[in-house]
């Protein structure tokens, strides 16, 4: 497949259908600029609409110091002081659009975190479906440390659903760092492993070998059912599963079971 042209990160797809997106500003701990936000947003939108061959995504950061240190102080923060309200809203809506693009892209997204993961970088990690990290990972939602609300880029929506309201409140009000062990204990991280890239890619490959249509449906239902009551959710799942039962992958799984072979999902 062809990715949109980007300057701030690298991207590639392997023969299993796993796309790897690597933030590539290691000298700035992969800090986010206006350009990075826009390119990432457009890439995840592209993966949703124009890349059916991509079946899973790994998001990682280059360099030894960390996954992402958040917004670049020079490129973004300093410039925001000269913007009026419409200009500020243009920026905050763009950052939110990136998180929306990650959450709503069709393939599952696996974050491979290491070192520093803070501010906007920590929100991007929270937007991924699964988060793996090295033992040296440190995460923080630093917004209150710079006089801003912890509710930024969807953090106040995402975190309570991941770690619960109480812990989300502590993280977003306190703005303090938590280490990998604590982040794993509270559910912010799924796994803590030494070789995070290998682990993340192995998991993404397993997902890529699975039923892409059903995985996309699962993502959609997890999002939808966060907004509805239990009765509505049960009915939504009934309809979703009936739709999956009409998909060729359901029959393929059954035929593979009868023939004692691995299924070949579409």
Task: Give the predicted meaning of each segment.
Residues 1-60, 100:
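Conserved CoA-thioester-binding segment of acyl-CoA-metabolizing enzymes
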Residues 3, 61-97, 117, 147, ...:
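Glycine- (often His-adjacent) and acidic-residue-rich active-site loop
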Residues 98, 102-104, 112, 118-172, ...:
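CoA-thioester-processing core
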Residues 175-182:
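Acidic, divalent-metal-coordinating active-site segment for phosphoryl/phosphodiester hydrolysis
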